Protein backbone atom coordinates (compact mmCIF):
# COMPACT_ATOMS: atom_id res chain seq x y z
CA UNK A 1 0.00 0.00 0.00
CA UNK A 2 0.95 3.64 -0.28
CA UNK A 3 -0.30 6.96 1.03
CA UNK A 4 -0.69 9.01 -2.14
CA UNK A 5 -1.22 12.71 -2.87
CA UNK A 6 -4.55 14.25 -3.83
CA UNK A 7 -3.14 17.41 -5.41
CA UNK A 8 -2.53 17.36 -9.17
CA UNK A 9 0.90 18.98 -8.80
CA UNK A 10 1.94 16.01 -6.66
CA UNK A 11 0.23 13.05 -8.37
CA UNK A 12 0.76 14.39 -11.89
CA UNK A 13 4.38 13.18 -12.18
CA UNK A 14 3.55 9.71 -10.80
CA UNK A 15 2.88 6.94 -13.32
CA UNK A 16 -0.37 5.94 -11.60
CA UNK A 17 -1.38 3.41 -14.24
CA UNK A 18 1.95 1.61 -13.87
CA UNK A 19 2.32 1.50 -10.09
CA UNK A 20 -1.08 0.17 -9.06
CA UNK A 21 -0.19 -3.38 -10.19
CA UNK A 22 2.32 -3.58 -7.33
CA UNK A 23 -0.16 -2.32 -4.74
CA UNK A 24 -3.07 -3.85 -2.86
CA UNK A 25 -4.62 -0.42 -2.37
CA UNK A 26 -3.86 3.30 -2.44
CA UNK A 27 -4.72 5.67 0.42
CA UNK A 28 -5.53 9.05 -1.15
CA UNK A 29 -4.60 11.81 1.32
CA UNK A 30 -7.58 14.00 0.43
CA UNK A 31 -6.87 16.87 2.82
CA UNK A 32 -4.58 19.88 3.15
CA UNK A 33 -5.86 21.38 -0.08
CA UNK A 34 -5.64 24.73 1.75
CA UNK A 35 -3.89 25.78 4.95
CA UNK A 36 -1.38 27.97 6.79
CA UNK A 37 0.91 28.31 3.77
CA UNK A 38 -1.91 30.49 2.36
CA UNK A 39 -2.08 32.70 5.47
CA UNK A 40 -3.06 35.85 3.61
CA UNK A 41 -5.33 34.27 1.03
CA UNK A 42 -8.99 33.30 1.38
CA UNK A 43 -10.29 31.21 4.27
CA UNK A 44 -11.23 27.98 2.54
CA UNK A 45 -12.13 24.31 3.00
CA UNK A 46 -9.09 22.14 3.57
CA UNK A 47 -10.71 18.80 2.68
CA UNK A 48 -13.63 19.43 0.31
CA UNK A 49 -15.23 16.49 -1.43
CA UNK A 50 -16.17 18.71 -4.39
CA UNK A 51 -14.86 22.04 -5.66
CA UNK A 52 -15.01 24.90 -3.18
CA UNK A 53 -16.81 28.08 -4.26
CA UNK A 54 -13.60 29.93 -3.27
CA UNK A 55 -11.47 28.06 -5.81
CA UNK A 56 -10.70 28.62 -9.44
CA UNK A 57 -10.85 25.85 -12.05
CA UNK A 58 -7.24 24.79 -11.40
CA UNK A 59 -7.84 23.96 -7.75
CA UNK A 60 -7.85 20.47 -6.24
CA UNK A 61 -10.52 18.60 -4.28
CA UNK A 62 -11.16 15.00 -3.26
CA UNK A 63 -13.45 13.77 -6.04
CA UNK A 64 -11.19 15.37 -8.66
CA UNK A 65 -8.26 13.32 -7.36
CA UNK A 66 -10.28 10.08 -7.41
CA UNK A 67 -11.29 10.79 -11.01
CA UNK A 68 -7.67 11.47 -12.00
CA UNK A 69 -6.49 8.19 -10.47
CA UNK A 70 -9.19 6.14 -12.20
CA UNK A 71 -8.63 7.87 -15.56
CA UNK A 72 -4.94 6.96 -15.22
CA UNK A 73 -5.96 3.29 -15.01
CA UNK A 74 -6.11 2.67 -11.26
CA UNK A 75 -9.06 0.37 -10.45
CA UNK A 76 -11.53 2.22 -8.26
CA UNK A 77 -11.67 -0.71 -5.81
CA UNK A 78 -8.00 -0.08 -4.95
CA UNK A 79 -8.68 3.50 -3.79
CA UNK A 80 -9.38 4.67 -0.24
CA UNK A 81 -10.47 8.26 0.35
CA UNK A 82 -8.62 9.95 3.20
CA UNK A 83 -10.40 12.10 5.77
CA UNK A 84 -8.69 14.35 8.33
CA UNK A 85 -9.27 14.16 12.07
CA UNK A 86 -7.93 17.72 12.31
CA UNK A 87 -8.71 21.15 10.90
CA UNK A 88 -6.99 24.07 9.25
CA UNK A 89 -7.61 27.67 10.29
CA UNK A 90 -7.23 31.32 9.31
CA UNK A 91 -7.38 34.47 11.44
CA UNK A 92 -8.26 38.09 10.75
CA UNK A 93 -11.19 36.93 8.64
CA UNK A 94 -14.06 39.40 8.05
CA UNK A 95 -17.49 38.48 9.36
CA UNK A 96 -19.03 38.00 5.90
CA UNK A 97 -20.50 34.68 4.67
CA UNK A 98 -19.48 33.08 8.00
CA UNK A 99 -15.87 33.72 6.96
CA UNK A 100 -15.92 31.45 3.90
CA UNK A 101 -13.96 32.80 0.91
CA UNK A 102 -12.97 35.93 2.85
CA UNK A 103 -9.43 37.32 2.85
CA UNK A 104 -7.42 36.36 5.94
CA UNK A 105 -4.55 38.23 7.56
CA UNK A 106 -2.87 35.22 9.19
CA UNK A 107 -3.32 31.89 10.93
CA UNK A 108 -4.51 31.27 14.51
CA UNK A 109 -2.69 29.39 17.23
CA UNK A 110 -2.87 25.63 17.14
CA UNK A 111 -1.95 22.88 19.59
CA UNK A 112 1.05 21.68 17.57
CA UNK A 113 1.63 24.51 15.14
CA UNK A 114 -0.12 27.64 13.92
CA UNK A 115 -3.18 27.05 11.76
CA UNK A 116 -3.79 23.40 12.65
CA UNK A 117 -5.84 21.83 15.44
CA UNK A 118 -7.20 18.39 16.19
CA UNK A 119 -10.93 17.75 15.80
CA UNK A 120 -11.08 17.18 19.56
CA UNK A 121 -9.83 20.72 20.25
CA UNK A 122 -12.02 22.39 17.63
CA UNK A 123 -15.17 20.52 18.65
CA UNK A 124 -14.68 21.46 22.31
CA UNK A 125 -14.61 25.19 21.44
CA UNK A 126 -18.37 25.17 20.80
CA UNK A 127 -18.30 27.72 17.99
CA UNK A 128 -21.24 28.20 15.63
CA UNK A 129 -21.24 25.61 12.85
CA UNK A 130 -21.71 26.16 9.14
CA UNK A 131 -22.23 23.61 6.39
CA UNK A 132 -21.56 23.71 2.65
CA UNK A 133 -23.68 21.01 1.01
CA UNK A 134 -21.99 21.44 -2.39
CA UNK A 135 -18.56 20.50 -0.97
CA UNK A 136 -19.82 18.29 1.91
CA UNK A 137 -17.76 20.47 4.22
CA UNK A 138 -18.14 21.72 7.77
CA UNK A 139 -16.57 24.83 9.30
CA UNK A 140 -16.78 27.11 12.31
CA UNK A 141 -16.38 30.86 12.54
CA UNK A 142 -16.27 33.07 15.63
CA UNK A 143 -16.24 36.45 13.92
CA UNK A 144 -12.52 36.49 13.12
CA UNK A 145 -11.23 32.89 13.13
CA UNK A 146 -12.30 30.40 10.46
CA UNK A 147 -11.66 26.66 10.97
CA UNK A 148 -12.37 24.02 8.31
CA UNK A 149 -12.58 20.41 9.49
CA UNK A 150 -14.46 17.18 8.94
CA UNK A 151 -17.17 16.25 11.41
CA UNK A 152 -19.55 13.29 11.58
CA UNK A 153 -21.79 14.72 8.86
CA UNK A 154 -18.98 15.37 6.37
CA UNK A 155 -17.51 11.93 7.03
CA UNK A 156 -20.96 10.44 6.38
CA UNK A 157 -21.22 12.32 3.06
CA UNK A 158 -17.75 11.13 2.07
CA UNK A 159 -18.71 7.57 3.00
CA UNK A 160 -21.78 7.88 0.76
CA UNK A 161 -19.49 9.02 -2.07
CA UNK A 162 -17.13 6.08 -1.46
CA UNK A 163 -19.97 3.54 -1.52
CA UNK A 164 -21.72 5.16 -4.47
CA UNK A 165 -18.55 5.13 -6.56
CA UNK A 166 -17.23 1.68 -5.64
CA UNK A 167 -14.11 2.79 -3.76
CA UNK A 168 -12.43 0.36 -1.38
CA UNK A 169 -13.20 2.51 1.67
CA UNK A 170 -12.10 5.40 3.84
CA UNK A 171 -8.87 6.02 5.74
CA UNK A 172 -8.07 8.78 8.19
CA UNK A 173 -5.26 10.90 9.56
CA UNK A 174 -4.83 10.70 12.54
CA UNK A 175 -6.54 8.76 15.35
CA UNK A 176 -5.36 10.94 18.25
CA UNK A 177 -7.24 13.89 16.74
CA UNK A 178 -10.65 12.31 17.42
CA UNK A 179 -12.84 13.33 20.36
CA UNK A 180 -12.37 11.28 23.56
CA UNK A 181 -15.62 9.40 22.85
CA UNK A 182 -14.31 8.32 19.42
CA UNK A 183 -17.21 9.88 17.51
CA UNK A 184 -15.31 10.31 14.20
CA UNK A 185 -14.04 6.73 14.24
CA UNK A 186 -17.55 5.55 15.13
CA UNK A 187 -18.91 7.63 12.25
CA UNK A 188 -16.49 5.87 9.88
CA UNK A 189 -17.53 2.44 11.16
CA UNK A 190 -21.25 3.19 10.95
CA UNK A 191 -21.04 4.67 7.47
How should each PLM-predicted stretch be described?
Residues 52-57, 143-150, 171-175:
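Active-site rim elements
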Residues 29-31, 47, 84, 137-139, ...:
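Flexible, active-site-adjacent loop/turn segments at secondary-structure boundaries
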Residues 57-64, 147-154, 180:
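Soluble or luminal CAZymes and related metallo-dependent hydrolases
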Residues 109-166:
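Hydrophobic, secondary-structure "cap" segments at the distal end of domains
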Residues 88-89, 150-191:
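Acidic/aromatic/glycine-rich contiguous surface patches that form carbohydrate-binding/processing clefts
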Residues 1-117:
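Substrate-binding surface in catalytic domains of secreted glycosidases
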